[in-house]
Structure formats: C-alpha cells, structure tokens
C-alpha cells in the first residue's frame, strides 16, 4: 500500500515542482530518467536541478534504482500523487486531504475538502504495482509485458472512469457526480451511503434486487455493461436507494465478450441476494435486451468524449496480463515504493 503524505507539498518550491514534472515527462520513454535529461527538460535557471533533485529524493517523490549504468531517477507513486494534487489544487478542486476510507488492489480512496469546507471523494488509481525485487526474480515479466508503465496505465484507468462517470451522470444514472480529474486521480461527489456488503438490514430486499437488475438492464439498453457489478461497487443510502461506483472495467455491449460480462454482473447480484436474503427474483436475459430498441449509444458517445478504443484495448490487455500472472502463480509484490534495495 502507498501512503498519501502531503506534508512536504507546502515546502516545495516552483523549481522543485518543475523538476518533478521533468522527471514525469522523461518517464514517458525511460523507466529511469537520466539526470542530464531531467536538467534539459526542466530548464531551470543556472542549468542544474541538483538541489531540487536532492529535495525530491529526500521526500521520496523520486527514487534511485541500483545496478544501472547511468545516473538517473524514477518517478514514485508519491511523486505522481504530488503532481496530480498540485494540478487539482490550482483548479481549486482540492484544498485539504483527510482520512483514507478505502484501499484496493488498484486504487486508494480518501476524503478531501475544498476551500469552502465541502467534502468530496478522491480516488487514486494505482495500476501495475510491481516490486523491483520481485521483478528480479521474474525477469521475463517486464520484457514480455505489452502494456505501458504503471503511471500511464493508472492515468488511463482514471481517464476512463471519469469519462464514464460523467456521461452516466449526465444521463440520469445513479452514480456520483464527477468533479475533476488529473493524471491518475479523480475527484467525485461524496455520498452518504454504505457499501452493499456492509449493509446488514435491507428494508425491502426484493425492491432493491429489482432496482439493481433494472440498472444492469438500463446500462445495456444504453450500450454499456458495468463489468464489475457486485456488493463492493454498489453503495446504499439510508433510504434504501442504490448508487453505483467504480467504472474502470465498463465495456460496450458490442464487446466480443459482452454477454459474458453481462451474465457475470447479473449472477453477482443473484448470488448475493440468494445467500444473504434467501431471495431469488427474475433474471434478465442479454439476448432479449439486445433485441430491444436502444435508449442511447453511450458507448459511442464515450469514445467521442476522448477515451478511444485504442486506450480501452490497452487497459484490457493489462487486465488480461494480470489474470495470466495470477493463473501462473507469479508472486509480484504490491509494495513498489519501499524496497530495502533502493535505499542509500
């Protein structure tokens, strides 16, 4: 897990952020960015980033990698967090960062506030958490990997989720209102609700079951399938109304495996209500829904908004690689940031 510690942010100078941005830019083509390249990109007066590099390294916003043939630095998760939060704070979307309220394999969730004290949710996507130490024992992993770097993948996931959330909200779906996003971070509406898995007393299970199935069907009639529709990604308000969250795995109904994803979403709800409430309701059929007239083609509208098929395929390829890795039993650590071998 990567801890979000923003205490150093207020003490970083404009030159420090310029240097950090230079490392980010160099990371597009280099896992470890040569120091001379950082100097060239940053273009700091005097020509040297030495002082800023020392400050950034001290705060673990960049890191050195041992056993390479040149001097250079890589961007850490913390460094990428700082760049995103700096951009969001400049746009007045974030003023303060509060408690962490969620952590997953691919994201961390925090409460944040704006200058007026209004609270929002900050979701930080963290795809591709890989330990260099583990990779040393799995040498073929990076060589054979077809997808991009962790920061690129995380940014893609955030871009996708924000695009889907925005268009769904605009069309009246029960999703959080999207506020802003930068790089791998999303700011969204904070909703007073609890995950379905944590709600032990649902007033009317049949009604909620039908509501959730109606949402799945409505997604499909608008050209979309959630792809991960389960008790972890549905939150329930005190009045019993449901809100859907978490959209990085959403796919079009034209996807080759659309029926598989649709049926999986449906069965997640069926099994949850059978297990927890001994209730079994009607089950929608993908073929029947496919024959209905579509309400909208939101999948096409999403692509027009900027998240295209190429990006979607890159994310899907990453997820397929991760599934294969799990099937092969590869044990790659999630702790990418704090390896003993990287300390000096």
Curated annotation (Swiss-Prot):
Keywords for this entry? ATP-binding, Cytoplasm, Kinase, Magnesium, Metal-binding, Nucleotide-binding, Nucleus, Phosphoprotein, Ribosome biogenesis, Serine/threonine-protein kinase, Transferase
Q: Which EC numbers characterise this protein's activity in its record?
A: 2.7.11.1
User: What's an example Gene Ontology biological process for this entry?
Assistant: maturation of SSU-rRNA
- Required cofactor names: Mg(2+)
Instruction: Choose one Gene Ontology CC annotation of this protein and give it.
Output: preribosome, small subunit precursor
The record places the active site at: 228 (proton acceptor)
Q: Per its UniProt record, what InterPro entries does this chain match?
A: Kinase-like_dom_sf, Rio2, RIO2_wHTH_N, RIO_dom, RIO_kinase, RIO_kinase_CS, WH-like_DNA-bd_sf, WH_DNA-bd_sf
Annotated compartments: Cytoplasm; Nucleus
- Predominant place of localization: cytoplasm
Task: Cite a single GO MF annotation.
Answer: protein serine/threonine kinase activity
Presence of the UniProt keyword Transit peptide in the record:
no
Name the residues that bind ATP. 123
SMART domains, alphabetized: RIO
> Domain Protein kinase: where?
95-250
Ranges annotated as biased composition (Acidic residues): 330-344
Tell me what reaction this enzyme catalyses. Answer: L-seryl-[protein] + ATP = O-phospho-L-seryl-[protein] + ADP + H(+); L-threonyl-[protein] + ATP = O-phospho-L-threonyl-[protein] + ADP + H(+)
- The portions of this protein that span the membrane are none
Region annotated Disordered sits at 311-344
Q: In which residue ranges is the amino acid composition biased (Basic and acidic residues)?
A: 311-329
Assembly and interactions?
Component of a late pre-40S ribosomal particle.
Q: Which family does it belong to?
A: Belongs to the protein kinase superfamily. RIO-type Ser/Thr kinase family.
Q: What does this protein do, in the record's words?
A: Required for the final endonucleolytic cleavage of 20S pre-rRNA at site D in the cytoplasm, converting it into the mature 18S rRNA. Involved in normal export of the pre-40S particles from the nucleus to the cytoplasm.
Entries under PANTHER family matching the protein: SER/THR-PROTEIN KINASE RIO2 (PTHR45852), SERINE_THREONINE-PROTEIN KINASE RIO2 (PTHR45852:SF1)
Please report the name of this protein according to its UniProt entry: Serine/threonine-protein kinase rio2
At the highest ranks, the source species' classification is: Eukaryota, Fungi, Dikarya, Ascomycota, Taphrinomycotina
Designated gene of the protein: rio2
């Amino acid at each position: 897990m990567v801890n979000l510690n923003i205490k150093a942010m207020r003490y970083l100078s404009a030159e420090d952020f310029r240097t950090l941005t230079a490392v980010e830019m160099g990371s597009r083509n280099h896992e470890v960015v040569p120091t001379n390249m950082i100097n060239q990109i940053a273009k700091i007066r005097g020509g040297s980033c030495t002082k800023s590099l020392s400050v950034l390294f001290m705060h673990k916003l960049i890191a050195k990698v041992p056993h390479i043939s040149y001097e250079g630095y890589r961007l850490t998760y913390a460094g990428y967090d700082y760049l995103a939060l700096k951009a969001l704070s400049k746009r007045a979307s974030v003023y303060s960062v509060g408690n962490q309220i969620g952590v997953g394999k691919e994201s961390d969730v925090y409460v944040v506030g704006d200058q007026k004290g209004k609270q929002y949710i900050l979701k930080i996507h963290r795809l591709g958490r890989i330990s260099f130490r583990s990779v040393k024992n799995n040498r073929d992993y990076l060589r054979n990997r077809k997808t991009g770097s962790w920061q690129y993948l995380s940014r893609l996931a955030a871009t996708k989720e924000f695009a889907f959330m925005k268009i769904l909200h605009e069309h009246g779906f029960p999703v959080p209102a999207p506020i802003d996003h930068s790089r791998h971070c999303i700011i969204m509406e904070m909703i007073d609700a609890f995950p379905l898995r944590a709600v032990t007393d649902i007033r009317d299970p049949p009604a909620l079951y039908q509501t959730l199935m109606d949402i799945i069907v409505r997604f499909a009639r608008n050209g979309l399938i959630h792809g991960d529709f389960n008790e972890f990604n549905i939150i329930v308000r005190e009045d019993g109304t449901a809100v859907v969250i978490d959209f990085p795995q959403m796919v079009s109904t034209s996807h080759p495996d659309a029926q598989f994803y649709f049926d999986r979403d449906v069965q997640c709800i069926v099994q949850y209500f059978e297990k927890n409430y001994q209730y079994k309701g009607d089950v929608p059929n993908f073929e029947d829904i496919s024959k209905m007239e579509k309400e909208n083609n939101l999948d096409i509208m999403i692509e027009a908004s900027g998240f295209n098929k190429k990006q979607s395929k890159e994310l899907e390829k990453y997820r397929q690689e991760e599934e294969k890795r799990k099937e092969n039993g590869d044990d790659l650590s999630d702790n990418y940031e704090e390896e003993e071998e990287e300390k000096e």
